[in-house]
């Protein structure tokens, strides 16, 4: 009788130890995540993912901006943005001209010719893309026919505010992030 109780006790202890080992191993492997895929452009990532700071991510555009642009300040009225190949684009958004980032903008008047196939916004974006690495953003204020393009070259962290009919874009994965 004593041997049976002893055998049952040993089996219960062994079962408990085995369950604890399985639980620890399960929790350890659950915490382990596959390494993030390294990327340079969105095409390097899977469907629904974007390249954010050199890693593929499924973050929303607004969360990606906050990850990529450390210490950025965004007005609570701004609830979304969109990914473009080189920029995070915000509609109805402007830089706060009272802050360091907004104080040093340079204006460029854009009035495309009728034969030009690009919109003024596209011209503004290309100006920033083709410029030097010092372009830290562009802003367009106007309509589809004409407006003013502002180029930013200040590495200070942007402060964005609501601005009707303004479009602002910040470079993705930029050296001044």
Curated annotation (Swiss-Prot):
Question: What GO cellular-component annotations does this UniProt entry give?
Answer: host cell plasma membrane; membrane; virion membrane
Explain what induces or represses this protein's expression.
Answer: Expressed in the late phase of the viral replicative cycle.
Q: Which residues lie on this side of the membrane: Intravirion?
A: 1-7
Location (main, coarse)? virion
Q: How does it sit in the membrane?
A: Single-pass membrane protein
Q: Tell where it localizes.
A: Virion membrane; Host cell membrane
Organism superkingdom: Viruses
Q: Which residues lie on this side of the membrane: Virion surface?
A: 29-177
Q: Does the keyword Membrane apply?
A: yes
Q: Which UniProt keywords apply?
A: Early protein, Host cell membrane, Host membrane, Membrane, Transmembrane, Transmembrane helix, Virion
Q: Where are the transmembrane segments?
A: 8-28
- What is stated as this protein's family in its record? Belongs to the asfivirus inner membrane protein p22 family.
Tell me the protein's name: Inner membrane protein p22
**Which source organism does the UniProt entry give?**
African swine fever virus (isolate Warthog/Namibia/Wart80/1980)
Q: What is the lineage of its organism?
A: Viruses, Varidnaviria, Bamfordvirae, Nucleocytoviricota, Pokkesviricetes
């Amino acid at each position: 009788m004593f041997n049976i109780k002893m055998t049952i006790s040993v089996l219960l202890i062994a079962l408990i130890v085995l369950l604890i080992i399985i639980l620890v191993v399960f929790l350890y492997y659950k915490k382990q995540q596959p390494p993030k895929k390294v990327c340079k452009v969105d095409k390097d990532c899977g469907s629904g993912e974007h390249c954010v700071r050199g890693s593929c991510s499924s973050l929303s555009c607004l969360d990606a901006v906050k990850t990529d642009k450390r210490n950025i300040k965004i007005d609570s009225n701004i609830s979304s943005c969109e990914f473009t190949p080189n920029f995070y684009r915000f509609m109805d958004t402007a830089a706060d001209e009272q802050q360091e980032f907004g104080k040093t903008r340079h204006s460029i008047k854009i009035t495309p010719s009728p034969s030009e196939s690009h919109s003024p916004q596209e011209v503004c974006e290309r100006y920033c893309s083709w410029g030097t690495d010092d372009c830290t953003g562009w802003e367009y204020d106007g309509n589809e026919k004409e407006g003013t393009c502002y180029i930013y070259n200040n590495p200070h962290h942007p402060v964005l505010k609501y601005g009707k009919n303004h479009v602002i874009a910040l470079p993705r994965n930029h050296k001044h992030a």
